[in-house]
Swiss-Prot record:
Function per UniProt: Involved in GBF1 recruitment, Golgi maintenance and protein secretion.
A cellular-component GO term for this protein: Golgi membrane
Membrane-topology annotation of the record: Single-pass type I membrane protein
Gene this chain is encoded by: Armh3
Protein name as it appears in the record: Armadillo-like helical domain-containing protein 3
Disulphide-bridged cysteine pairs: none
TM regions (residue ranges): 520-538
Length: 689
């Protein structure tokens, strides 16, 4: 037994002697994790530390391996390391600055990771010490601001932004991240704007800058005055707003391109041939294979810009060559982390006005068109939670746009016509529309097409009621503008009317299932009131008198659906159930639709009998309608052109808190600090002796 122990001892000694030597930086980290001040024995300790290549994994792992008590014992050394990192940011040698930035990232992440399981110490105290926190963070933010605004290294700017993203997203709920109080006090808003307004910086760092801004805007936005919200709402510099728009356009365009590539690859493959052979039984499965990860972070940035800054609305309509049709000039690919599809922008800014001029042969586009295409992809499939959130946010953004007077002006402008190829969900009963046959029309037509497309493709068991309500509200707000400004839009209104009637039919045929989960009468009332808008005010905004005739024809043709709806709501409004009041509102709203049906149906039957015709053509019905308008009596209904304006704080706060939490987690997961190798940095900073 003693011999075995001896052998074991010898073996241990032998294996220990073969153990690789620790790199010097790791030995220095180990000294920091002792209770003694490492600079006592080595006065140049901190100076030397920042010349060493950072070992992020070791530093973070070491912090996570200690329990709360052990960490508190070395608190002074951690504070000292944090302060020396901040001091190193002011050094002339860029290598020191880079190492200090990376060390700060490791420190912040390591201490926060520790805090998840041990809440017995405060993070600010652990990193900086309560007494020095204010000055430390002031110095840190000032250094980061200087580095971001300087004309120096793009690699340093990239690391500064990554450190800030690390700082912001280190907790899932950013509003619980107390360190951000110092980021509010020591604002870097102007530095972010400078990046966005300066084309070279925007090309390299625009995406990170926009995501950072979107997250900072959401810090305790409902509890206190957030300076980033205040400042973003008053930005009026054209170059800055356009820069932000370009970054968002690029990111959404990249998503659209990836989706289109996947779609084409899928259609040309074996599975497509198999689908054609056996019919459409695989359509749903095939469609799900086309899923590309959504980009909620950039969508949130677009929402905040549209919602907070009225000047940004002009950026939506800024024309530029369509990104998919333009070849970007050759340029080195910036060092960005490998992230999932749809989460990173293209590598170069292909729409700088300096680099590209508009060509008459090239299809022009703008941010709104890119966004509508993005929405048409995301809103196809709402079964997945991320896509459901993205679809909801798309509709919220469209709601804000539909309420804005200036946005409506360019949406309805006859002189701003575009061909917008929206993505349509594969369905058995319809063929894929040929993109080339699409006419150039005002942009509001594409918005209405998108709403109609959503209405007809989501009548399913898992009914997305919230999205339907928002969709119908967008249509209503657009109609209110058309009525108010007497805009006669040349649109195929019949498609909208047909979609709305089919939606009513769906609600009625699934009454029992839907009523168990939803108040279907709110949606039914909104649909009926859309028809009331057309009936009451259609003569002021429908393109031609014949369009108004077609409205009546459609109501008369589908009278059975309206009769069934009336029977259903009458039944529920006369019972003493929970739906009594909601159903009675629909009953009252149907008064004019029922008046039209009851007025014209006998006249049509009489016309058919007199002329011995068993089935009247559309033109014959329209002839009867035109001849009998004079004797029709309708009731004037109030408030049809009124609506409640969008309000985030009261109705959407829970949604945005959850969305920002999801974005924060995703950004943190995809943050990479190893994108810059030490060799690449040494090459860039070749001035170092």
């Amino acid at each position: 037994m003693a011999q075995v122990e001896k052998r074991g001892g010898l073996l241990r000694k032998s294996s220990a002697s073969k153990k690789p030597l620790k790199e010097k930086v790791v030995l220095m980290y180990d000294e920091i994790f002792m209770t003694e001040d490492p600079s006592k024995c080595s006065p140049r300790f901190w100076e030397e530390l920042f010349l060493m290549k950072v070992n992020l994994e070791y530093l973070e792992g070491k912090l996570e391996s200690l329990d709360g008590e052990e960490l508190m014992k070395i608190k002074d050394n951690i504070n000292c390391l944090f302060q020396h990192c901040i001091q190193a940011l002011g050094e002339e040698h860029p290598i020191r600055v880079v190492n200090a930035l990376q060390t700060l990232c490791a420190l912040i992440r390591g201490v926060h990771q520790k805090n998840k399981s041990t809440s017995g110490f405060d993070i600010i105290n652990m990193l900086m010490g309560f007494d020095k926190a204010e000055l430390c963070m002031k110095n840190l933010m000032e250094s980061l601001d200087s580095l971001l605004c300087a004309e120096g290294s793009e690699s340093l700017k990239s690391l500064c932004l990554k450190l800030l993203l690390c700082l912001v997203t280190v907790t899932d709920n950013i509003s619980q991240n107390t360190i951000l109080e110092y980021v509010m006090i020591n604002s870097i808003f102007e530095a972010i704007l400078q990046i966005l307004s300066h084309p070279p910086s925007r090309r390299e760092h625009g995406y990170d800058a926009v995501v950072l801004l979107a997250l900072l805007v959401n810090y305790r936005k409902y509890e206190s005055v957030n300076p980033y919200i205040v400042k973003l709402s008053i930005v009026d510099d054209e170059a800055t707003l356009n820069g932000m728009g370009l970054v968002i356009t690029q990111a959404l365009s990249e998503y659209n391109r990836q989706y289109k590539d996947k779609e084409e690859e899928h259609q040309s493959g074996f599975f497509s041939a198999l689908t054609n052979m056996v019919g459409s039984m695989f359509i749903a499965d095939a469609h799900e294979k086309l899923s590309v990860q959504t980009n909620e972070a950039i969508l949130l940035a677009l929402y905040e810009a549209v919602h907070l800054n009225r000047n940004f609305i002009t950026v939506l309509a800024q024309s530029h060559p369509e990104m998919g049709l333009v070849t970007a000039p050759a340029s080195p690919t910036p060092t960005t982390p490998a992230t999932p599809l749809g989460t990173t922008p293209p590598s170069s800014d292909v729409i700088s006005s300096v680099e590209l001029s508009l060509d008459a042969d090239v299809q022009t586009s703008n941010l709104l068109i890119t966004f509508l295409k993005y929405s048409s992809i995301v809103m196809q499939d709402t079964k997945d939670e991320h896509r459901l959130h993205s679809g909801k946010l798309c509709l919220i953004i469209l709601t804000c746009i539909a309420e804005d007077q200036y946005a409506n002006a360019f949406l309805h402008d006859d002189n701003m016509n575009f061909r917008v190829n929206l993505h349509r969900m594969p369905m058995r009963h319809r063929k894929k529309a040929a993109d080339k046959n699409l006419p150039c029309r005002p942009l509001v037509c594409a918005v209405l097409d998108l709403m109609v497309e959503f209405i007809v493709t989501h009548m399913m068991k898992e009914f997305p009621m919230d999205l339907y309500l928002r969709c119908v509200q967008v249509v209503h707000k657009l109609l209110c503008y058309q009525k108010k400004c007497r805009v006669r839009l040349h649109y195929t209104w019949r498609e909208l009317w047909s979609a709305l009637i089919n939606l009513l039919k769906f609600l009625m045929s699934n009454e029992t299932v839907l009523l168990a989960k939803h108040n279907i009468f709110t949606l039914a009332l909104m649909i009926v009131n859309l028809f009331n808008m057309f009936i009451t005010y259609g003569d002021t905004f429908l393109p031609t008198p014949s369009s108004y005739d077609e409205l009546y024809y459609e109501i008369i043709r589908m009278h059975q659906s309206f009769d069934n709806l009336y029977s259903m709501v009458l039944r529920l409004s006369t019972n003493a159930g929970q739906w009594k009041e909601a159903a009675s509102k629909v009953t009252h709203a149907l008064v004019n639709i029922r008046a039209i049906i009851n007025h014209f149906n006998p006249k049509i039957e009489s016309y058919a009998a007199v002329n011995h015709i068993s089935q009247l053509s559309e033109e014959q019905v329209l002839e009867v309608v035109r001849a009998n308008y004079d004797t029709l009596t309708l009731k004037l209904q109030d408030g049809l052109d009124q609506y409640e304006r969008y309000s985030e704080q009261h109705k959407e706060a829970a949604f945005f808190k959850e969305l920002v939490r999801s974005i924060s987690t995703n950004v943190r997961r995809n943050l990479a600090f190893h994108t810059l190798s030490q060799e690449a940095l040494l090459k860039e900073f070749s001035t170092i002796s």
